[in-house]
């Protein structure tokens, strides 16, 4: 994957526009989870230290496109950056016709979704973004799968388009895990529906030595083995697909589970064999035997790709399966890569972030990359590197 890297460029005195992923949760004007901003800080700091005229922009939330809405303003992000950086930081609301930036100053360009044509990758808007800079830095892996004006179009028209350190690191880590994995390679795919992850399961079944399924996805595989899954979340119409995958790939289907009579935080967890599930019960977590069996597999792995929890870990009574898996990954010597919102929440909950080799910042982009799809922003950077 050949792209120009920001770290290989001399940025002194240049107008540098960084497209970061600063789409963070905000409550009452304050950032409530700063993980994405923290991940973007090193890129901003490199450009500032080199004496560049730095602009950074992002989307935040889902405002009506083309309309200013204070609720989705990047102002809370600006306040956060002011606390973390020694350089001056300010917000620019109207910037499409040009913005003055001093060397060593950071100007945050207001939410790109306030601009008409952003999502449609409008050429006129893309050219306006491009005219703001000498160097465009794409550093938002989380939006690299979307062809939009601030992630894709701008890069076609900017004098130079390059990958920021966060995006470069993400592509290298995923490339390492998928193209030449150290073996055995184990992939974990959790989540509620097989339908949304079918392509991922299919792609991974071809490269993983073992494929661990969890959550609602695992319930469909339990049903595919002929067991009653009661009121559990599962997809009956995808049982043939699950059977096909069971024939072609080593998938350790749970042998015991934790069930409840209702989907609630206070529901009592009952441990039982998959052969004994009653009509009124629903599976909400793995059982101890199954979880330990998976932990053993993970301890012997050399590459682990983790996307999705294996149970309803948000409920304390149904957390044990995901925690057992998480701790096994943390203790493993494998190169481990984790991605997806629920997965990151589980990593935070169990405090194992420093034990995972690489944590991906992308949800949809992470899955599309794993599926083998081309990400529009990355394709654009590759094209520009050839010019």
UniProtKB/Swiss-Prot annotation:
Pfam families: PGK. It is found in: Cytoplasm. Keywords: ATP-binding, Cytoplasm, Glycolysis, Kinase, Nucleotide-binding, Transferase. One of its GO terms (molecular function) is phosphoglycerate kinase activity. InterPro entries: Phosphoglycerate_kinase, Phosphoglycerate_kinase_CS, Phosphoglycerate_kinase_N, Phosphoglycerate_kinase_sf. GO terms for cellular component: cytosol. It is an enzyme of class 2 (transferase). The keyword Nucleotide-binding applies. Gene3D superfamilies: Phosphoglycerate kinase, N-terminal domain. Substrate binds at residues 21-23, 36, 59-62, 113, 146. PROSITE patterns: PGLYCERATE_KINASE (PS00111). Pathway: Carbohydrate degradation; glycolysis; pyruvate from D-glyceraldehyde 3-phosphate: step 2/5. It comes from the Bacteria. Its EC number is 2.7.2.3. Its main location: cytoplasm. Belongs to the phosphoglycerate kinase family. Monomer. This is Phosphoglycerate kinase. It comes from Pectobacterium carotovorum subsp. carotovorum (strain PC1). The gene is pgk.
């Amino acid at each position: 994957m050949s792209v120009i890297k920001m770290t290989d460029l001399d940025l002194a005195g240049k107008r540098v526009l960084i497209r970061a992923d600063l789409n963070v949760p905000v409550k009452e004007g304050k950032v409530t989870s700063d993980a994405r901003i923290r991940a973007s800080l090193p890129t901003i700091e490199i450009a500032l230290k080199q004496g560049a005229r730095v602009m950074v922009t992002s989307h935040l939330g889902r405002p009506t496109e083309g309309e200013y809405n204070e609720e989705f303003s990047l102002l809370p992000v600006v306040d956060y950056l002011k606390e973390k950086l020694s350089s001056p930081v300010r917000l620019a609301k109207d910037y499409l016709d040009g913005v003055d930036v001093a060397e060593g100053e950071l100007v945050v360009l207001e939410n790109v979704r306030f601009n008409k044509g952003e999502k449609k990758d409008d050429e006129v808007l893309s050219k306006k973004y491009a005219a703001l800079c000498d160097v465009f830095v794409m550093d938002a892996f989380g939006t690299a799968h979307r062809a939009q004006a601030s992630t894709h179009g701008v890069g076609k028209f900017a004098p130079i388009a390059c990958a920021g350190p966060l995006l470069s690191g993400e592509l290298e880590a995923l490339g390492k895990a998928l193209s030449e994995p150290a073996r055995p390679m184990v992939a974990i795919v959790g989540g509620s529906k097989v339908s949304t992850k079918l392509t991922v399961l299919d792609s991974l079944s071809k490269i993983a030595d073992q494929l661990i399924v969890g959550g609602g996805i695992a319930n469909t595989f339990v049903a595919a083995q002929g067991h009653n899954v009661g009121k559990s979340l599962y997809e009956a119409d995808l049982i043939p697909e699950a059977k096909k995958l069971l024939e072609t790939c080593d998938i350790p289907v749970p042998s015991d589970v934790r069930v409840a009579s209702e989907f609630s935080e206070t529901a009592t967890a009952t441990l039982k064999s998959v052969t004994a599930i009653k009509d009124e019960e629903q599976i909400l977590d793995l059982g101890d035997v199954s979880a330990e069996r998976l932990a053993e597999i993970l301890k012997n792995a050399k590459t682990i790709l983790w996307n999705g929890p294996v149970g309803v870990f948000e409920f304390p009574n149904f957390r044990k399966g995901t925690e057992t898996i998480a701790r096994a990954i943390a203790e493993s010597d494998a190169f481990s890569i984790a991605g997806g919102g629920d997965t990151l929440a589980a990593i935070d909950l169990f405090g194992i972030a420093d034990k995972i080799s690489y944590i991906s910042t992308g949800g949809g982009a992470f899955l599309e990359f794993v599926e083998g799809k081309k990400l529009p922003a990355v394709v654009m950077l590759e094209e520009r590197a050839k010019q």
